[in-house]
């Protein structure tokens, strides 16, 4: 039986996105820009480089107010050209 994400979450809730993308200086700014459009706030993303330094992971935590916000952010973060994966 498949459980849907909205059945597991109770809103509002704290939700962290982990965005993996190319190790380019603009990655963090692009991630924060997308998040600000849907969940305005003061963010301090955590950045970790990959072992070879080709990629960075950017973790950013929001207070989600509804499931549509969570799903829209997954989609829009994934649409950033230099992003490879969103968890």
From Swiss-Prot:
GO cellular component: cytosol
Top-rank taxon: Bacteria
InterPro entries in the record: UPF0250_YbeD-like, YbeD-like_sf
PANTHER family tied to this protein: UPF0250 PROTEIN YBED
Family, similarity comment: Belongs to the UPF0250 family.
Name assigned to this protein: UPF0250 protein PC1_1177
Species of the source: Pectobacterium carotovorum subsp. carotovorum (strain PC1)
